[in-house]
UniProtKB/Swiss-Prot annotation:
Residues 254-317 form the PAS domain. It comes from Caulobacter vibrioides (strain ATCC 19089 / CIP 103742 / CB 15). Residues 545-795 form the EAL domain. One of its GO terms (cellular component) is plasma membrane. SMART domains: EAL (SM00052), GGDEF (SM00267), PAS (SM00091). This is Uncharacterized signaling protein CC_0091. It is found in: Cell membrane.
Length: 809
């Protein structure tokens, strides 16, 4: 009979003839429960770090050791040799300590690194521990006989124990699942049971009457009670710890999942390139429930990158996410990181990826880019984009041989619409202009807005110039001439155009735009509603006016302007009763510049309102300082008259300067009224309510004068000097002056004669009951310092009529 056969025979004989099979089953059940609990604890120990790991390891070793120990001694109680037996307390307890120590050491080695070598080494330690515990326990066994050991069978038992423990660790692996825990526990239990009963079959008891069993030894019943109690408490404690930890982990996991699902970003956990878990946001992005995603490959199928290693840690990159249920690819930003909570290693090999949907960001970036390149109101290219596009267009035509024209456009009636109807009306004109320009040009030509009411069209065409540009310019003039409906009325439109051609008028974007602007300036001088091509002779003239406009703007800011005052005298006695404020400009290098030179420049360049406001403030401040309460007359430009803020400005100036409202006289022309008749009358009524006097200037040169006098109670009428200077020279002029003076008497409106230059004119006007006189015959315009003879209290203020025939300013 071979050794194997002999061992099997002795094992079966030992079990069937020397053991109580019921207790054998109990021992096996205790062993199985203990081993299963051991692997439950082992899985927790592998998933922990630091002090927590050490605590789980200690508990694992204690439960495993007590399970082996309990199995051994319950099986020993089942052993019935037919002799009196007992157990040494010291040896019994020492065997428990040996079992716990070896078990803890074996599991520590197995979990130190995830490898077959570690599992094998740990299994050997555990198997040897089971053998050491068994034979230490056998040393605590006392009976009335001599124990004879069969060493080959003893060796076989140790091999079975080591083999069972090693197989258990190899099969269980990390023991993450219940199934693996059950397999590992069952295999370890089998190894323990096989070692025990094989070892028991290795002994033969030779009865010896001389040997006695001391009464102080543990009996079988006492041992069963002690072992059962201790082992039950340890195993139940281990199971309780596992249950508590599992519940805690589930609660924490649920909290984490809720937080993850509340996150705006998609979160996905990947292991070996496959989806392990994901939050609700990621599922929504992919368009599939979590159950369909788990186990699917993430990279390549759902998420693609340009990088070769998409799961590299702590790298932020952009990629494309492909929804599972159709739809367009979604641009995403992905940040990946290895999972590590600082205490657990269950996440070993797992990578968490935060996936952010970039569609809104891309849309916002595109909008920002669009706004940076386009005008916010009209949607046309803005000035910066125009420069780049025009430079690119020049490169294109240089290579292709096409022709290029730059057309500068200015709206003729924009300012009037803006002033009369408000900014909404102005915006409506700009938007409609942009729409018409876009409909008039086709790619590769394009339109842009420079700012205000200035637009640019860049024409790229294949025809001959200037014919092609002239055709487009004429078409634009016609298109922009049609009125624009707004708020139940039609706003007047119209435009002036300046055209420059490449390369004749410039080879750079800056030169072409500057020359087109000069041509536009000439078009506006020609009466508007026309287009003009750039010509070299325009350059010097227009540049001079541009320089003058620039200097005037700076001059207003630097207080280079001064106000001269021309006296007005009562016709009856010649006493000065007031002054008219007349602006003068003393240029730092050019000297005095006549008003006829810089006033038109101010009107053309939008400076007239600022100029008028400055004169109003300066004149009121000067007049407030005079000792005599003489009146001060200030001219209002049409733009000022139609500005809704004019009454507020006048009120503020009067308060600031301290000038009495009755001393301020505002002069307007008839032509200024009719640009927006109703708004002008509203402003005049508000000014009258302040106590300010209103005079109609240049009476007789406009139209509908009588209806104007009927509509508003003017305080004064000023006869234009073109009639006064022809008194006694032309009968019609004399008759007109006499008629106006008669009209003033009938309406009880004082009349002032402008441009009085001779004594003969003074005598005629005095004879016709003219109220006041103004002109060189009365006094020249002079700075405020030269007025003291009239403005100082106590001075009679009368002037002697002059016969010099000079033109008044």
């Amino acid at each position: 009979m071979t050794l194997k056969e002999r061992c099997v025979f002795k094992l079966l004989t030992c079990l069937t003839t020397q053991h109580d099979l019921r207790l054998v089953l109990v021992a096996s059940a205790v062993c199985l429960a203990g081993c299963f609990t051991t692997f439950r604890l082992y899985s927790r120990m592998r998933g922990a770090r630091g002090v927590v790991r050490a605590a789980w390891l200690l508990l694992t070793g204690l439960v495993a050791g007590s399970s082996v120990w309990a199995t051994h001694f319950i099986a020993m109680v089942a052993f019935t040799p037919g002799l009196k037996t007992g157990y040494s307390p010291t040896g019994t307890l020492l065997s428990l300590m040996i079992a716990a120590l070896f078990m803890a050491s074996g599991f520590a080695v197995a979990s130190a690194q995830r490898s077959t070598t570690n599992d094998f080494a740990g299994g050997v330690l555990i198997g040897l521990g089971v053998a050491a515990m068994h034979y230490m326990g056998m040393s605590a066994f006392v009976t009335q006989g001599q124990l004879v050991w069969e060493h080959a069978t003893v060796g076989m038992s140790a091999v079975l124990g080591v083999g069972g423990a090693t197989a258990a660790l190899l099969l269980a692996g990390t023991a993450r699942t219940i199934r693996r825990q059950a397999v590992g526990g069952g295999m370890l239990c089998l190894g323990i049971v096989m070692l025990h009963f094989t070892g028991m079959s290795a002994i033969t008891i030779v009865p010896d009457a001389s040997l006695t069993v001391p009464d102080q030894l543990l009996s079988g019943g006492m041992l069963t009670l002690a072992v059962g109690s201790i082992t039950s408490m340890i195993i139940l404690g281990g199971l309780g710890a596992v249950a508590i930890e599992s519940q805690t982990s589930r609660s924490a996991l649920e909290r984490i999942r809720r937080l993850a699902n509340a996150a705006y970003e998609g979160l996905v956990v990947v292991q070996s390139g496959r989806i392990n878990d994901a939050n609700a946001a990621f599922c929504d992005l992919v368009g599939a429930p979590l159950a369909e995603l788990v186990g699917r490959p993430l990279f390549g199928e759902i998420l693609t990158f340009d990088e070769a290693d998409p799961s590299r840690e702590d790298v932020r990159r952009e990629g494309r996410l492909r929804p599972l249920v159709g739809g367009r690819e979604i641009p995403v930003e992905v940040f990946s990181r290895l999972m590590d909570d600082g205490a657990r290693v269950e996440t070993s090999g797992l990578t968490v990826l935060a996936v952010r949907d970039l569609r809104e960001r891309r849309a916002a970036e595109e909008k920002i880019r669009y706004l940076a390149e386009h005008d916010g109101l009209t949607g046309l290219l803005n000035r910066n984009s125009l420069q780049m596009r025009l430079a690119a267009a020049i490169d294109r035509v240089e290579a292709s041989g096409e022709s290029l024209a730059v057309i500068c456009i200015d709206l003729d009636h924009f300012k009037e619409a803006n002033d009369q109807h408000g900014h909404l009306a102005g915006d409506a004109l700009l938007v409609e202009t942009a729409r018409r320009l876009q409909s008039a040009v086709q790619a590769p030509s394009f339109a842009a807005r420079l700012g205000g009411d200035e637009f640019i069209v860049v024409q790229i065409a294949g025809g001959d110039q200037p014919a092609v540009a002239a055709e487009l310019a004429g078409r634009l003039i016609e298109m922009l001439a049609a009125p624009v409906p707004f708020d139940g009325q039609e706003l007047a439109m119209g435009s002036s155009l300046g055209v420059s051609l490449y390369p004749d008028d410039g080879r750079t974007a800056e030169a072409l735009m500057a020359n087109a602007d000069m041509a536009l300036y000439r078009a506006k001088e020609s009466g508007r509603g026309v287009y003009r091509f750039f010509k070299r002779e325009m350059d010097d003239t227009i540049r001079e006016r541009r320089n003058l406009a620039r200097d005037l703007r700076q001059g207003i800011a630097d207080n280079e302007l001064i106000v001269h005052y021309q006296p007005l005298a009562r016709a009856a006695d010649g006493e000065v009763c007031g002054f008219e404020a007349l602006v003068r400009w003393k240029h730092p290098t050019r000297g005095m510049i006549p008003p006829l030179d810089f006033i038109p420049v101010a009107e053309e360049n939008g400076l007239i309102e600022a100029l008028g406001d400055w004169v109003l403030r300066r004149a009121c401040a000067d007049a407030a300082a005079w000792e005599k309460p003489l009146r001060i007359a200030v001219n209002l430009s049409p733009i000022q008259l139609h500005n809704p803020a004019l009454p507020t400005l006048v009120h503020e100036v009067l308060i600031t300067t301290g000038l009495s409202p009755s001393r301020l006289e505002l002069e307007i022309t008839e032509s200024a009224l009719f640009k927006d008749y109703q708004r002008a009358l509203d402003n005049l009524r508000r000014l009258k309510a302040l106590g300010v006097r209103i005079a109609m200037d240049d009476f007789g040169t406009g139209f509908s004068s009588l209806s104007t006098l009927q509509s508003f109670p003017f305080d004064k009428i000023k006869i234009d000097k073109s009639f006064v200077e022809n008194i006694h020279r032309h009968d019609r002029a004399t008759a007109i002056v006499r008629a106006v003076l008669g009209l003033g008497r009938s309406l009880e409106i004082p009349v002032v004669a402008e441009g009085v230059e001779t004594e003969e004119q003074i005598l005629f006007l005095r004879g016709e009951d003219c109220a006041e006189l103004q002109g060189y015959a009365i006094g020249r315009p002079a700075p405020v310092d030269a007025l003291t003879m009239w403005t100082t209290a106590g001075d009679p203020g009368a002037i002697a009529p002059k016969s010099k025939t000079r033109r008044s300013a």
